[in-house]
From Swiss-Prot:
Protein's name according to its UniProt entry: Minor capsid protein P13
UniProt main location, coarse: virion
Entry function: One of the minor capsid proteins that constitute a network internal to the major capsid proteins and outside the lipid membrane. The minor capsid protein P13 does not serve a cross-linking function between neighboring capsomers, it may play a role in the viral capsid assembly.
Recorded domain comment: The hydrophobic region might anchor the protein in the underlying inner membrane.
Name of encoding gene: A421R
Species in which this protein is naturally found: Paramecium bursaria Chlorella virus 1
Induction: Expressed in the late phase of the viral replicative cycle.
């Protein structure tokens, strides 16, 4: 065994101990932020409110259209809704449901 070998081994062990100590020294408790959980909850509330408002808007729109087009079309206008009898002022507005 060479004279320097014990010193080299001691130096390597000291470097390893120092590295382990430096990594262990910073023991701060980490708080994890989950983007999926936190943002998902907020987004679901916003999305549900938006959908509810949209459905309410469609229902109001359909109610207005029912008032504006109270007559059902017939003959060539079967499936249409009309403003007056005898197929007057008919439309095939897509969102309208009777």
């Amino acid at each position: 065994m060479h004279k320097i070998t014990p010193f080299l081994i001691a130096a390597v062990v000291a470097v390893i101990v120092l590295a382990v100590w430096l990594f262990k020294k910073d023991n701060k408790k980490e708080t994890w932020f989950s983007r999926d959980l936190n943002y998902g909850k907020a987004n679901s509330k916003i999305w549900n409110a938006t959908v509810a408002k949209g459905l309410k808007g469609i229902a109001n729109e359909n109610a207005e259209i029912r008032k504006m087009y109270p007559y059902l079309g017939y003959g060539d206008f079967t499936g249409a809704i009309c403003k007056g009898p005898n197929n007057q002022g008919c439309t095939y507005y897509a969102n309208y449901t009777r």
